[in-house]
Amino acid sequence: MVLIAFGSIGDSFSVGSLKAYVAEFIATLLFVFAGVGSAIAYNKLTADAALDPAGLVAVAVAHAFALFVGVSIAANISGGHLNPAVTLGLAVGGNITILTGFFYWIAQLLGSTVACLLLKYVTNGLAVPTHGVAAGLNGFQGVVMEIIITFALVYTVYATAADPKKGSLGTIAPIAIGFIVGANILAAGPFSGGSMNPARSFGPAVVAGDFSQNWIYWAGPLIGGGLAGFIYGDVFIGCHTPLPTSEDYA
């Protein structure tokens, strides 16, 4: 049975942990800047027209590439989470303590918010698009969609990055993670927006001042990420081991 470790103040404020928080902040900022920036660019080029298939592909590819790079640049320092749902999933599997994970969340949310503030400034005040479910769908349907696609993301993180038996598969973890996010945006984008990431949705909501549907992008991803962490960590990895360093799961 996997054990969840709460952690200690000393560990969470060690030099290594502080460096990890900075790495999460920077990597999340760069990911969200590119991801949300691609959506803003689409709206500008199309005069805020409805998202068409070409635009969906462009936004999905931008997120996939940006996440691939973001995970890669943070992997050796923080593990390259960039996502509270990933952090929760890894905490459920015993790969990071709850306390340290909480500070990861803060760094990720701050990174996303700063990215969106920068986008608002450099685009001369263009609207920062927020996530929301499509017309005709309800919040529960959006939550279920986000549970499924976030489960797929965190399951991929476990299989390619966190599993002790991953071997050489770990070298493709960042690109596999980017691929699953891009694919999920193609599948879910027209319905729930395809967030999979509370931080990705939080920053735009803060800058736009619109939290009307933001709960969907906390509930769905956290449930999906937690389930993936429990199933892969408990069923497939199967036993608790001492908390690894970031290099062991990134």
UniProtKB/Swiss-Prot annotation:
KW Transport (keyword) present: yes
Gene3D superfamilies assigned: Glycerol uptake facilitator protein (1.20.1080.10)
Motif (NPA 2): 197-199
Cleaved signal peptide residues: none
GO biological process, one term: water transport
SUPFAM superfamilies: Aquaporin-like (SSF81338)
Molecular function in Gene Ontology: water channel activity
Family membership: Belongs to the MIP/aquaporin (TC 1.A.8) family. TIP (TC 1.A.8.10) subfamily.
Transmembrane regions listed in the UniProt entry: 20-42, 55-77, 97-119, 140-162, 172-194, 215-237
Domain notes: Aquaporins contain two tandem repeats each containing three membrane-spanning domains and a pore-forming loop with the signature motif Asn-Pro-Ala (NPA).
Tissue distribution: Roots.
Principal subcellular localisation of the protein: membrane
Summary of the function given for this chain in its UniProt record: Channel protein in tonoplast. These proteins may allow the diffusion of amino acids and/or peptides from the vacuolar compartment to the cytoplasm.
UniProt keyword annotation of Transport present: yes
Pfam families linked to this entry: MIP (PF00230)
Keywords associated with the record: Membrane, Repeat, Transmembrane, Transmembrane helix, Transport, Vacuole
Residue numbers covered by motif NPA 1: 83-85
Membrane protein topology class: Multi-pass membrane protein
Protein name: Probable aquaporin TIP-type RB7-18C
Subcellular compartments: Vacuole membrane
GO cellular component, one term: plant-type vacuole membrane
